[in-house]
Amino acid sequence: MKGIYTLLFSLIVLVMFSACNDEWKEEQFEHYISFKAPINSNGVTRINLSYSETGKTTYRLPILVSGSTKNDRDITVKIGIDADTLRTLNIARFSSREDLWYREMPSKHYSFPETVQIKAGENVGYLDIEFDLTGLDLVDKWVLPLTIEDAPNGEYKPNYRKHYRKALLRVMPFNDYSGTYGGTNLQGKLVDAGAGENEPLVKSEIVTYAIDAGTIDESRQDRRNYKIIAHFVPNTNIVELTSDNSENNGFKINTRASSYIEEEMDAVRPYLLRRTVMIRDVDYEFEDYTLAPGARIKFRFEGTISM
């Protein structure tokens, strides 16, 4: 009897495994089309674009065919712009504070083909987006909002989950000098402020953005009026600090800044290069003319920042 039970158990196991194997011969999910563009905590997908001398760069955005089996046919996916989704995000996150909204990138700064081909036997294709970053003012938060459009002939189905069919690309150009600098060694103070003049103003981090291949800007929240542009003069250690609004904010340099760059291989992971960029001898003044209507508040900053 024990032998009979063993035989029956073996037959049941074989049938179960056979059934499982048969299941995987057929598609378990729809072959939906989606972007590979995971969002961050701000609701957008940050893409870092290396700044070239020409200002032009290419970003390859993956387009996926979901499912448990291989795609067995050629698919032509149509891509379009979706300003409505960007507006919905802005209203949900910032309400009526339009000064905080993400801005749709002007069409002169990008181009991409209307369709992407995904070949039979492949589950991924790429949308090649050509960006021209020349003259792009990073005072605004630029986003390229994309969507997978419905197939005119019904040959594919877009993934209707919001963050799969849509891609809100937050464009972040970078160069060798842009990034987050430590600001603890850059001290500011109020000028002509009486008892409060000697109180130090310190910011632990200073985020800089690329303007071109060798220029960055460091800004406060109201950065349209108070941008500071740092140009690293080629083949020297000179850093030229300027403002494009000095006639209003009274920006003035007291000492010419200089740069120091140190590179060394990591002691533990020798395949990593550690690069430190320092901007030294920073000494400038400016006047805040928007914080308090009718008043001008003068600041002076001195020290070093490093990344």
What are these regions (language model features)?
Residues 1-8:
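Bacterial N-terminal signal peptides that target proteins for export
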Residues 15-19:
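C-terminal motif of bacterial Sec signal peptides marking the signal peptidase cleavage site
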Residues 21-117, 126-143, 149-307:
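Intrinsically disordered, low-complexity regulatory regions in eukaryotic proteins
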